[in-house]
Amino acid sequence: MAQAGRSGDAFASLDQRRERQEEQAQSGLDKVFYFQGVVELFNRMKIAYGRTPAWTALMKCNAIYLKDFKTAVGVEGTRYGLFFAEEVTKPTWSPDIGANLITLGEKACLDAQNAKYERLQASLKTTSGLVHQVMEKTREAKENLEKANKIQEQLDKVIESNKALHRKIQERNREKMQEYMVRLHNTQKDRDDWVQRCSRLEQENVTLQKRLKEKENALVSVGWDLLGWIVISVLVFGLISLADAQNLTPPAKIVITPGQAEFMDLAKLEKIQVRKYRLDSCELPPEKGCVLYKDYLTTRPVSFLELMAKCSKPDWVSESSYNETTLMEECIQIFGAEWCEGKLVDLVPRKCGEQHVLVNIIEQIEKTREVVTLIYGKVMSYRLDMWITSIFSLVLAGNKEKLFKMAPFIFVAWFLNIPVFLTCVAVNIFPVVSLPFILFQIFMPQFVLVNAFLLWLTLTLTAFYWSEGPKILMEISYALVYTIGFVLWSLGLAVGVTLKLTMVHQILMFCVVAAAICGTKFACTTITVQHPDGTTAKYTRVGKLKNNVVNQCKKVVTTLQTRGVIPATPAKTASIVIVEGKNGTGVGFRFMNYILTAEHVVQGSDIATLKNGSVSVKSKVIKTIPIFESVDNVAVLKLPPELNSVKPIKLAKKVQSDYLTLTAYDPNFQHAATFTGWCIIDGNWLNNSFDTKFGNSGAPYCDHDGRLVGIHLGTQGVLSQGIVIVDALKNTFQLADQCRPQNFDMDEFLEKVIAGTKVSHAAILKELEELREEVQFLKKKCVTYDDYWLCQTIFGQAKGKTKKTVRGRKHLVTKRALGKGHFMKMRMLTDEEYQNMIEKGFSAEEIREAVNALREQAWLNYCIDNDVDDEGEEDWYDDMVETDRVNQEIDEAIERAMEDRGEFYQKKSRLTFVEQAMMHLIQVSKERSQTAKLEVQKENEAQLVKMFERCVTDENTPEGTTSIAALSTEDDVRLVEGKVIDFTKAKNIPVDGEIRREIIPGTKCTEISTGPENKKNILKKKDTHIAEGKVETKSSQQPVDVKDDKPVALEQRKPRACKWCGSSQKHDYRECRFQREKRFCVYCAAMHSMFEGHIRPIECTSCKKSFSGIEKLEDHVVSGECQKKLIEGPVTTKAPTPVPDWLKIFAWEDDILPPEGKTALPENVTLIGHIPVDKLVSRTKKVQDPLLGLVTPWKQDMYDSTTWTVKAYTKMFEKFHYHDPVDFVEQYAEFVLLCDNMVLREHDYMANSNITPIMSTEKNVNSTPAYPKFQAYDSEAEYLEDCGWQEYLDVVSDPETINRRPLWWCFLKNEVLKREKIEDSDIRMILCTDPIFTRIGAMFEQDQNNRMKQQTEIRSAQVGWTPFFGGLDRRVRRLYGDGDRYFVEMDWTRYDGTIPKSLFWRIRQIRFFFLHDSHKTPKMRRLYNWYVKNLLEKIILLPTGEVCQVKKGNPSGQFSTTVDNNMINVWLTTFEVSYLFFKQRGRLPTEKELQENCSMICYGDDRLLSIRKGFVEYEPDTVIDMYKNIFGMWVKRNNIKIQDTPEGLSFCGLTIVKSSTGAYVGVPNVNKILSTLENPVRRLPDVESLWGKLVSLRILCENAPSNVKHFLDEQISNVEEFAARENIQLPEVGPDFYSRIW
């Protein structure tokens, strides 16, 4: 009953699926007889009549012929029905009168279609019966297996009881054995303890003896040190007692201000002096006046008036600024001698404040200095320095040996009155052998050279006789060093004696010389440590500490930078949907197979509406998940099948405060929107820092890995909050573990499974044998040998064993016709390729389109290679779906039967083509067919390659024999045809075990080698002898009869003629057939081919307008040009046309011819070759536009549209040879480093930029595709429409690409120029190359370019800026900074062409450095370097056909010309300012100084610079000379302007002026832009375009003089009047339109 129930459910689901298919737009199309245009006609009729009973009756027919929009004929059995719609709303169906309205040909086609449908139904019934039989057999086998399992369970119980008894016996014996072992172990342990205790006691005795000896030595050393310090202390305190402390304190100086002298007497004055000492301790608060304090820094003298002002209130006056004589003179000069007498008697002590604590400290320091000076004087007077030096030298000797050596030399130094310290230094430094020489030098200083020579001889001989081995060389080297040191010491000694250096000077001289000699070399010595494993490591003593400090600082900086930089986050817009409930609308997202949202969004609703794009479905609310501490919950909705394309979001691995992204919709729910910012996790609450909108409730918060963290609940006032749901979702959706006992033993469980498998193995094999017999029966039903081979392919190999891509592989060796459905379900991408496309940002729809395009291409290649007619393949999709549905269960049963078997079978994971290497050998002749297929693991790939080389010989196959040998590994793919194959060398490779051989009836001989983790190497071999009428297989037990007695042989490919045009030349066979095959035309109502053309003219039935083709008529109707519109049908997808070899990117290498002589190239440019091209060389005629007759020309004679001759091509090469640059990287290394840092700092927003997939890059598709593609296509859009993206993908993935060179196409720019430039043939050159090369550059740079466009308000580069709406004003005011600046305008001449190669390469490497680390793979690095190399070293094709090479400059037609020029401009400007700064100040400026004192804006080579006055003086002549001699770049003097204000300077063609409101606005070059009204560069299409051009000019000239605006207003008025007369509608422009834009 359960089986019947499941069958019923299956048929019920089948009926539901069939109903859904009938509701689809294409349902019923497979029944329609095909002719050209039938798809569009069918869709229009279905839309018009799809809901009428007549149309329903028509769709029930087996075959349908659509005669026209109102008439159709349907066949069901032998009845021919007629569908006729006299009115759109009332069509009729007549079931028996249709045969009278069709021709015999049409009737034959309908009969064929009807017969095909009936055959399909009969086949389905037959197949269904076979499916039912297989399922019944399978069910019986399962029942038998269950019975066997029950028996096995009973046996297991008996075995388990025996095992339990056996275990008890073993446990008892084990316990006794363990008891004996414990006793033995305890005994051994006690013995070991006694041995260890004895050894420890011995070691302690030795250690105590060593310590005792060390203490004795330490006491002796301490005694000597104590004696020395006692002597020093006695001397120091004795000398201090000699000092007179009273003389060190100067007497206080106290003055009384005027007005208080009469109240003071001498007694009081003495009291004040006493108070002065108290004043120093801040105890006496004076009432009024000044206190004179002693200072130690000279200050400005105080004037009399300043003194009176200070002393009118409590204040302090420094002693150095108080000069009584000067003050008295000033007073007498101002007030007279009489008044001034007695005014400056003395100062009264006043207030002592906290600010004068420093004064007390300075006084204490001064007193200390005086004490020290006095002590030092006493020391020198009594020659105590000699005593102190001697005592210190003896105390610091360190050991007795040095003490006894120095004592006599100190006595000698005292006796001869020579420096004691220098003598002690010599005794300590030089070896013992040199002591006699030192003594001799003291007594006889005039023989220094002889003495040094004798010392050197003595030390060298001593080293030779006293040392051994390599130490001799070291000692000899030391001898030389000691000798040099001895000479220096002798000179120092002579200087000391002559100059009578004091002790302090001797010590200072020695320390300075020692530090200069040693430096920091020994402190920073690198130590090499060799580890036991053979590795070495180097450590630096000081460097290690330095590195630790640097690393800690870097960590702090990185943390601060990370906190302020928003990381890149994957877009999750494909994972959200709109959720509509009864009370509101919110956002939902997919998690697993559910849609989650906030509960309040669907509150009160059991059913919610989910929307995603154009899909809108209903879904049921399954449950809610409560969230701790939250008033809201998470609602869980069922995922409808229609939303399976919505991508699920994975849970976050770690939840912490970080930058999170909220993915939601805009307020109108039209487009997805993302909000990124810093979010704080507070328990379960999530607080964000960005503004959200109403309707964002339920949106997911994702981390920078795109994983789910929380859900948005809403906005509470100014605070937007969400809730963390990671733990809640883990607890809710976590799968429950299977319950098992605590003492569960997995090994024991596996043993039971193995035992059960052995018991039931025979029964399973019996069932398998029965299934094999049924398979053999199905094989015998095959009516042709081709069907047999197809059946052999299906049943002989389980699906999924190997996964290959169709691109570039050879098809099966037999000549059998495959259907289109076979190709449309093939795997076109490996897992690796598919994952790479996902990581590069391709959506599911884009990947699906790319795969379908590859499938279409594979099908077309198959049809052309095998001369297969693809007629009738329009219904491939329905046939494929129906076949898959019928054969699904048969495939599953056959796969189970054909799996590898063993005693214990564990199904292994299927290995894909990427994961498992494979060798496939096929050799077929008329009498014999041999195949061998070997699949091995990755670790056996090398053995497989060697076996392949042994099997494939160098001998060619004889006539009538064909062979193919294929090898596929992870890194190599080989295909060899036409060579004799030695099948005896094809043997299996053992993994880690024996090779098991099996004979599977009806298939092949199979050898299996199984290793650990069920890894297997499988060899399948087959040897078939072909006789008349039979196929005999050696390894098969039963012969298989085949009705088709054709021999199986592979025909060698040979030239064939096209059956449509008769040509044997290679061409587009599909297009040829499409043009010449006759089809029924719905417009002509007759059979004809596209080559013959339509019989009657094609015209619109509404406006009677004629067209040359049906496509143009359809475009006319759909575009709405006429009032009557047809219903637009679906856009038909066209399979891409294979790209001919002569149009591919590197095809120019085959087209180039030897040089034929120069036509346009100058002498200094080398001619490489010649390629004939049919392009315009000279332009002598100007464009004539009749529409410009409506306007009056602007009067000017300066500008004109360009014309040129061949001379212009010669002239344009001058910019590449203006002047050669120097090696500025080596000569100006510090400047280069500074410039690099400034460029990195200026463009740091480009960091961690991403690579854009080549199919997602954006560029102008209407531009020329360059050579060789412009030979067939005028634009890239046309090329993509025909050929698709395949060549783009092949070039990027092909490793040989970096070994090829693209070709640049050169042409002159048609623009408005000065007439003298036109007369001088000075026309700008444009370079462009193949769009594939351009898009490779866009892969690396599109993200960076877009980021630069977003930074124009705060950065220098102005790509994407606008001068309107105050844009120019804001940028000019940014240049002002904090004022006090001057402005510099500079424009290079031929900027692009003169950029040094090394500078351009440097900027390009900086751009690669800004890429995210995940993109900096070796492959991407090689591809990027190849791209940059071809930007620098360009191979150029001229319209004259000449091919040359240029190795300088930035090509103007590359993807990032302006962005690169901006970065180079920043680099050069930094160098320019630093060069002037260095010249004027003798040092380089710092980065901070440059940022604070210089600002700039630039667009390509256009630059406006502001410099703070006093920072650097701008010297134009120096700048011009610098650019020429260092970089080889051209700057003219008249292109440099320096002003204090920006008014009058220009930027991007706009002269800066101030408007009446005080804002900075721009005025264009009026004569240049208005000259196009007389001499245009291209014609305008219509009057509307002319009006738009005039309005645009009027916007630009809003700030120009009034006569210019008046002129343009008149021209606009004239055009508007003309348009009104001709009934042409033009937009209205308001009165303040132009001014508001600025």
Swiss-Prot record:
Ranges in a coiled coil: 130-222, 758-788
Record-annotated RdRp catalytic domain positions: 1381-1515
Keywords, ordered alphabetically: ATP-binding, Coiled coil, Covalent protein-RNA linkage, Host membrane, Hydrolase, Membrane, Nucleotide-binding, Nucleotidyltransferase, Phosphoprotein, Protease, RNA-directed RNA polymerase, Serine protease, Transferase, Transmembrane, Transmembrane helix, Viral RNA replication
Entry superkingdom: Viruses
Reactions catalysed according to its record: RNA(n) + a ribonucleoside 5'-triphosphate = RNA(n+1) + diphosphate
O-(5'-phospho-RNA)-tyrosine PTM positions: Y834
Catalytic site: H600 (charge relay system), D632 (charge relay system), S697 (charge relay system)
GO terms (BP aspect): DNA-templated transcription; proteolysis; viral RNA genome replication; viral translational frameshifting
Site location (Cleavage): Q170, E171, Q552, C553, Q797, A798, Q916, A917, E1051, Q1052
Listed Pfam families: Astro_VPg (PF19416), RdRP_1 (PF00680), Trypsin_2 (PF13365)
Ranges that cross the membrane: 220-240, 379-398, 407-427, 437-457, 479-499, 507-527
InterPro entries: Astro_VPg, DNA/RNA_pol_sf, Peptidase_S1_PA, Peptidase_S1_PA_chymotrypsin, Rev_trsase/Diguanyl_cyclase, RNA-dir_pol_C, RNA-dir_pol_PSvirus
Modifications after synthesis and translation: Cleaved by the viral and host proteases. The protease is probably autocatalytically cleaved.
GO (cellular component) term, any one: host cell membrane
UniProt record similarity statement: Belongs to the astroviridae polyprotein 1AB family.
Stated name of the protein: Non-structural polyprotein 1AB
Organism: Turkey astrovirus 2
Lineage: Viruses, Riboviria, Orthornavirae, Pisuviricota, Stelpaviricetes
